[in-house]
Amino acid sequence: MQNFTVSEHEKLNTAVALGFFDGLHKGHRRVILSAVEQKKNGLLPVCFTFAQSPKEVLGKSSKGALMTTEDKLKTLESLGIEHTFSPDFKKLMNMSAKDFVEKIIFGNLNAKFVVCGFNYHFGKNGEGDTDLLKKLCDENGTELKVIEPERDDGDVVSSTLIRSLVSEGNIRRANKLLCSYFGFSAVITHGKRLGRELGTPTINQKLPENLAVPKYGVYASAVTLENGKVYCGVSNIGVKPTVGGTKLLSETWMPDFHGGEIYGQTADVRLLDFIRPEKKFDNITELKNAITDNAVTAKEIFDEMYRYGV
């Protein structure tokens, strides 16, 4: 997937999906796929999304993102988006709503079709809404499609709802709404060698900066190593109080991994379901026994969910 350059507007007519798209949940995907569908009409599907969260820049949110920028771009490409346009929010945050649409969406992007969610706002202080966008699109002869809210069990599907689910440990429902698995990729670092007690290595990882933090506890997970192999994992997200930890880390045991040294490699960890809260055990033996029991549950969840879908 390529980053859209301003000069391209002279030769390309586009279908533009507007939004920040944190998590690319069910509702977001309806927006994205509406733009992708316009390929049949000869339009190039483009996603307009800021490089930084506007809420974070404005100090309105500090609960973290549902996916990294890298994951977002990979997912957009898998959905059929061919180009992204990701300007610095700080450079456009004081632009009026009218100028934003006329200069950026119609001007730079040459949009002939625009799609956004029902609650999309734009321009300085978020002054623009879908009513204004419709007016401007009508005046320009540009088609506008506004996606109505996606609902699940009576709740409007939103990034805010999913962040709450993640913080509560309700990863199973969060994954359902995300249409993917919440997780992260990070370098494997040295830990306290707990894996030696368990018979196979554990992998220690720092969570990516600004990622939403799940409820502290043990999760069934799916771990993909650099060689492409996927293993069932038992992941502890928290501070590891039994071994005197104080810093937030992810530590994952892969009971079926026997592949040797993997420190320094990057592993992708996807959380499948919550097993139990983090607990301080009286000794390492109790911790080892608990993790061994958790592995039985994790394998059942892995076989149910990861191999056959969310």
Task: Briefly describe each language-model feature range.
Residues 6-68:
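N-terminal catalytic cores of NTP/NDP-binding nucleotidyl/phosphoryl-transfer enzymes
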Residues 9-12, 91-94, 151-155:
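A short acidic, often aromatic-flanked loop/helix-cap motif at beta-alpha or helix-coil junctions
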Residues 13, 191-310:
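Phosphate/ribose-recognition catalytic cores of enzymes acting on nucleotide-derived substrates
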Residues 25, 76, 114, 174, ...:
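Residue-level signal for inorganic ion chemistry
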Residues 42-46, 82-83, 112, 143:
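Residues at the starts of beta-strands that form the adenosine-phosphate
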Residues 56-118, 122-139:
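N-terminal Rossmann-like or analogous alpha/beta NTP/dinucleotide-binding catalytic cores
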Residues 137-238:
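Glycine-rich, Lys/Arg-enriched anion-binding loops that position phosphate/diphosphate groups
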